[in-house]
Amino acid sequence: DRPCHSYTGRMFARIQSDIQCILERDPAARSRWDVVFSYPGFHAVVLHRMAHSCWSSGWTWLARWISHWGRFLTGIEIHPGAKIGERVFIDHGMGVVIGETAEVGDGCTIYHGVTLGGTSLYKGAKRHPTLGKGVVVGAGAKVLGGFEVGDGAKIGSNAVVIKPVPA
């Protein structure tokens, strides 16, 4: 077993899973090729996974560079330190911002214009929200602060959330 081969296998399995989740959740998705070539939310998540891997390995400059290009190409800004679960779907993602200490659980759906932002400037502190599994965040919502949004919660479009949300 070569470590790189193992990592590459896991990476492609996650990509397959991400594609499948989009096909299941978006009636406009016609095929795998459609998702791979024309879904900026998918591109942003794949680029984030690369950036996060670099960030976690101490290659912060490379992580920031990948993140910067991801934002330029997709209009979606995900800090390389953010943790993104599996089968996360960013739909119509233009303007999405996900901060450094944010965590997005498995199976979440995030629509355009969403901010998972911080409310403090303290380095090393948990400044951004944690979304549980299966959370849906509607277009334009702002979720601000280092608190938890429970599994399966639904946050309405244009909501401003500054306190924990129960499951």
How would you describe each model-predicted region?
Residues 1-74:
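Terminal amphipathic alpha-helical/low-complexity segments used for targeting or macromolecular assembly
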